């Protein structure tokens, strides 16, 4: 799981109407001109909601950095988003021994790094060494620990890697789908010098970012744009021997505001777009009325999770021998249950998602047909029940707008999410207003995304957050979120030992689920994890939106699926 960024809402109806009217006046010439330029140059124009925090794929913990480095580096395998089965990438084939403890990867021999050096098995072994280095903070290590041990690897030759597991590990193939290999000849000396954590930061000149992916980064201008050019030495060819990818490059503009992103799509400045719920019907109308030459398609339900979480980290609340009373509230199950009953999911669905969403009960999406727990009962929105629960637990309403804890401290905390995200802003506003009716003072302070991630990763200076994470087909890919020692276990990360019995139980269930090789016997372990999270409430689920994709008709072979783009290397613009 990786932290997910998007946008922010509240533009007045008048302002929006004026903006759209202005666009309508000159949209005709702009749309055609931009579209023709994109077709002529074979450059895909897109946007992203925030700046990256790093260009080092091993150190990525946020969605923006992950997206912007994703095309620079190749993985050993890849997920087919249609079949959800693994497919070859840097490893052209693989064999699993009968004991399920040895996997042999046969690597491609025609892959070169951007600087012309050959890709070899040594690069894979080096990448594993970096991931397992405790001095290198990364999200891959929890996913690749087997029985709390590293996977041992050897290279009999330059194009063969043999992985030796301490015991069978069902999620390994899925883990290799996200395993981005980095160049040993560039980064191994840096790692040995102890400076890997500073390598390839956002100030690194793009020509020094040496990958093996489909695109090279040509330019990064902070808070403005990222430009990519095609890797003309990329190993993949089409059925006629033509070079892939077919696009010659990408232009990714950094646009923190969703309304601005939408206007860019309407004006033809970007080629693909993930519409928000309130934009689906207007876009469909513009398509039907031939105002825009686009496609719009529902592709499924969000595969990620969007939740409120209260900070349980002692590093935030216990300092200099003084304990902030908030930690007592945020670890009190009665308090958390009351908070869960104050999440007005129906209003969020109706007002924020325009009916295009459903209540979320678990962190695993129902799109994951195998691992989503179908038996969980939702916490119904019930302010009276929540008030009664708080009173019974000693959180008394002492004035119409003031509620105190059992020791007389006023219930007051900060609530945050990332700026530039209208949907989350409105959800936080709904939650804040409802809690204040219970006498709980909520200080809502949205933060710029990179600042927010710094608070989650480093300072732990937050109380309550509305946060989203992406989801995958393999639940163990979220081990850095589930596991008590994980760096994305956001309510109390990087625990040396589990802080609670239920977190220890989740750690055990993760190990058991990962070692079960029979796919029909694995779901109960992850259903139980979802049940524990549902009962203990380190995260309070909100809603899960329907996902739509829209793109220009001039863009061919653009095939968005709920689990990702299908054969994105074949995308191209129609010739004029």
Where are these regions (language model features)?
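Mature extracytoplasmic/periplasmic domains
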Residues: 188-191, 356-375, 548-551
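Active-site-proximal polar cores
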Residues: 542
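Bacterial N-terminal signal peptides that target proteins for export
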Residues: 4-16
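Bacterial N-terminal signal peptides
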Residues: 15-24
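A structural "hinge/loop" feature
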Residues: 50-66, 90, 117, 172-182, ...
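Surface-exposed binding/hinge segments that line
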Residues: 95, 106, 141-193, 219-221
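N-terminal lobe/hinge region of extracytoplasmic solute-binding protein
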Residues: 47-98, 129, 210, 214
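Extracytoplasmic/periplasmic ligand-capture domains
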Residues: 8, 28-36, 82, 95, ...
């Amino acid at each position: 799981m990786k932290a997910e960024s998007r946008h922010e809402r509240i533009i007045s109806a008048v302002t929006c109407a004026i903006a759209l009217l202005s666009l309508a006046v000159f949209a005709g010439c702009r749309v055609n001109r931009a579209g023709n330029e994109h077709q002529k140059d074979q450059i895909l124009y897109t946007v992203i909601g925030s700046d990256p925090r790093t260009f080092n794929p091993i150190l990525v913990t946020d969605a923006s950095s992950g997206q912007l480095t994703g095309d620079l580096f190749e993985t050993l395998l890849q997920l087919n988003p249609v079949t959800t089965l693994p497919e070859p990438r840097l490893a052209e084939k693989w064999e699993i021994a009968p004991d399920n403890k040895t996997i042999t990867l046969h690597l491609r021999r025609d892959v070169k790094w951007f600087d012309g050096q050959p890709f070899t098995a040594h690069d894979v072994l080096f990448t594993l060494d970096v991931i397992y280095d405790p001095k290198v903070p990364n999200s891959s290590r929890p996913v690749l620990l087997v029985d709390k041990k590293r996977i041992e690897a050897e290279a009999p030759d330059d194009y063969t890697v043999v992985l030796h597991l301490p015991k069978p590990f069902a999620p390994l193939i899925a883990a290799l789908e996200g395993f981005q290999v980095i160049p040993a000849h560039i980064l191994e000396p840096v790692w040995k010098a102890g400076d890997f954590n500073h390598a390839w930061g956002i100030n690194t000149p793009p020509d020094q970012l040496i990958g093996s992916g489909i695109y090279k980064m040509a330019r990064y201008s902070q808070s403005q744009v990222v430009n990519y050019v095609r890797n003309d030495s990329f190993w993949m060819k089409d059925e006629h021997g033509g070079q892939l990818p077919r696009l010659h490059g990408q232009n990714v503009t950094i646009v923190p505001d969703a309304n601005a992103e939408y206007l860019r799509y309407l004006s033809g400045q970007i080629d693909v777009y993930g519409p928000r719920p309130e934009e689906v019907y207007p876009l469909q109308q513009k398509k039907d009325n031939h105002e825009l030459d686009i496609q719009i398609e529902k592709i499924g339900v969000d595969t990620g999770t969007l939740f409120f979480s209260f900070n349980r980290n002692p590093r935030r609340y216990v300092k200099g021998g003084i304990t902030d009373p908030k930690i007592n509230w945020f670890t009190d199950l009665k308090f958390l249950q009351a908070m869960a009953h104050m999440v007005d999911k129906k209003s969020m669905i109706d007002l924020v998602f325009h009916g295009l969403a459903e209540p979320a009960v678990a962190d695993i999406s129902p799109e994951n047909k195998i691992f989503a727990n179908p038996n969980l009962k939702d916490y119904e929105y019930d302010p009276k029940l929540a008030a009664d629960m708080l009173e019974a637990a000693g959180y008394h309403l002492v004035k119409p707008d003031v509620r105190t804890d059992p020791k007389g401290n006023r219930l007051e905390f900060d609530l945050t999410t990332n700026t530039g995200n209208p949907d989350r802003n409105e959800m936080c506003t709904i939650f804040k207003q409802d809690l204040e009716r219970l006498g709980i003072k909520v200080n809502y302070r949205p933060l710029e995304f990179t600042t927010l991630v710094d608070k989650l990763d480093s300072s732990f200076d937050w109380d309550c957050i509305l946060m989203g994470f992406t989801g995958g087909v393999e639940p163990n890919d979220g081990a850095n979120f589930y596991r008590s020692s994980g760096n994305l276990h956001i309510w109390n990360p990087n625990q040396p030992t589990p802080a609670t019995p239920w977190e220890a139980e989740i750690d055990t269930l993760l190990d058991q689920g990962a070692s079960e090789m029979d796919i029909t016997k694995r779901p109960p372990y992850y259903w139980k994890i979802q049940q524990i999270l549902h009962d203990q409430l380190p995260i309070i689920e909100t809603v899960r939106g329907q996902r739509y994709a829209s793109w220009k008709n001039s863009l061919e072979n653009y095939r968005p699926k709920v689990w990702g783009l299908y054969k994105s290397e074949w995308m191209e613009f129609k010739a004029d």
